[in-house]
Swiss-Prot record:
The active site is at C379, H515, E517. L-glutamine binds at G352, L380, G381, M382, Q383, E403, R470. PROSITE patterns: GATASE_TYPE_1 (PS51273). It catalyses: UTP + L-glutamine + ATP + H2O = CTP + L-glutamate + ADP + phosphate + 2 H(+); L-glutamine + H2O = L-glutamate + NH4(+); UTP + NH4(+) + ATP = CTP + ADP + phosphate + 2 H(+). UTP binds at S14, K187, T188, K189, P190, T191, Q192, K223. Belongs to the CTP synthase family. Allosterically activated by GTP, when glutamine is the substrate; GTP has no effect on the reaction when ammonia is the substrate. The allosteric effector GTP functions by stabilizing the protein conformation that binds the tetrahedral intermediate(s) formed during glutamine hydrolysis. Inhibited by the product CTP, via allosteric rather than competitive inhibition. One of its GO terms (cellular component) is cytosol. SUPFAM superfamilies: Class I glutamine amidotransferase-like, P-loop containing nucleoside triphosphate hydrolases. This is CTP synthase. Signal peptide: none annotated. Pathway: Pyrimidine metabolism; CTP biosynthesis via de novo pathway; CTP from UDP: step 2/2. Catalyzes the ATP-dependent amination of UTP to CTP with either L-glutamine or ammonia as the source of nitrogen. Regulates intracellular CTP levels through interactions with the four ribonucleotide triphosphates.
Amino acid sequence: MTTNYIFVTGGVVSSLGKGIAAASLAAILEARGLKVTMMKLDPYINVDPGTMSPTQHGEVFVTEDGAETDLDLGHYERFIRTKMTKRNNFTAGRVYADVLRKERRGDYLGATIQVIPHITNAIKDRVIAGSEGHDIAIVEVGGTVGDIESLPFMEAIRQLAIEVGREHAMFMHLTLVPYLAAAGEVKTKPTQHSVKELLSIGIQPDILVCRSDRMIPANERKKIALFCNVPEKAVISMKDVDSIYKIPQLIRSQGLDDLVCARFGINAPEADLSEWEQVIYEEANPTGEVTIGMVGKYTELPDAYKSVNEALKHAGLKNRLSVTIKYVDSQDVETKGTDVLNGLDAILVPGGFGDRGIEGKIRAAQYARENKIPYLGICLGMQVALIEYARNVAGMEGAHSTEFNKNTKYPVVGLITEWVDGEGNVEERSEKSDLGGTMRLGSQLCHLEKGTKAYELYGSATIHERHRHRYEVNNLLRPQIEKAGLKVSGLSADKKLVEVIENPAHPWFVAAQFHPEFTSTPRDGHPLFAGFVKAAGQFQRGELK
């Protein structure tokens, strides 16, 4: 099978939405019956985003095989059915590390290692390996054209397009077309300069996707086509919309997928976007609204919780409810008290690291438990719920996690030193292990106990969910907590690690060690989030019992 490549680049400014545009195109091509995959090439020197600050980079998305990747891979999985793996995202740091490792081994037989050809060849090899077995691979290059860091990647995709043949490669470039209110018109000059920069490194775009707050007028489209050397029909308007799930229809209406199929000589049926039409209908026609408080420490940047935000929206679609997320800094709960949690229909404590704001999260879990407010804890959100219950119900005064207090009398949460991964291999860690890539990562099997809330929600005794953590419930103290009434409803494959807890004395109090948000999609939702948002609606109406 010959794979066709669409290389996606961006210009003028960052954060234009390359990932959304690429994923939307992928969704349309998939709806035409094509086998599509996506890749993200990140020019930064970090080996992966696993140890990067969420306030700088946004969330770390975890794939089924345990790769810590860019949040754009979350967009990819939410738009298409293909599951991402460690092959679908790599960084300049990863490429350089691999090349240097080979040089130390002597694989290059004494050659002088250079960006061209060694780094560019390594990039091309990874792109080819990650796209095998697919009709179309959409490859997004991070950053903005002109960045020093992205030059090796730009050179690599330029070379690869020549090597596979231009009949099997396309370049799609996203640019900004700003509207100047004073002049009353959109300006095309930034796009012209961006394409000029791209041409200077040997890449002629085949498609221009123009980001603006409005549709690009016909005269301006003609002007862009003329000065940027692309057909007028290849100038695509991508205006601001109130939902990212409207983008597939927006670009389909302008024939972007037809351009791609014509270029690659693909004869495929028309795209069936009925599933996306249903998503848009559900989003536009809610029967009610709920407010969910997200208590975390990275609340100044919503992208730090991108998958959780989207999962809540998906759950809203399944319940025909509009979900408003109120971000609550956990430090505010510490300094201002639980009054900041008043008026919420449900409380969610997501994952996180570090002790800043930890007591605020614990108090939020206590507030939800005592006031019978629906509570969903994810990863650290499960651990704080357990700590709170141990302290205030089980009589274990000062109970804590060894992540935050190594000398606690009741270490109800501690470092995992050994576990079995998703492939059955035994993994071992210690406090001296590196931070990067040393967590329990990826999809793991979980056993759910029949008759529990978790089992009721999933409708199955076995599930697979993705993990990203290095601390777990201390089994030595577990019996004391369970005796006080807390229910362990989910266990790992070897039955040694606690995966799900719930409070039978509460109408809806569930917390999981895994990250269910990574598998939620707009078309299918996720049972845990769907049940949580449903409970929020019932709580608001006074029907939750």
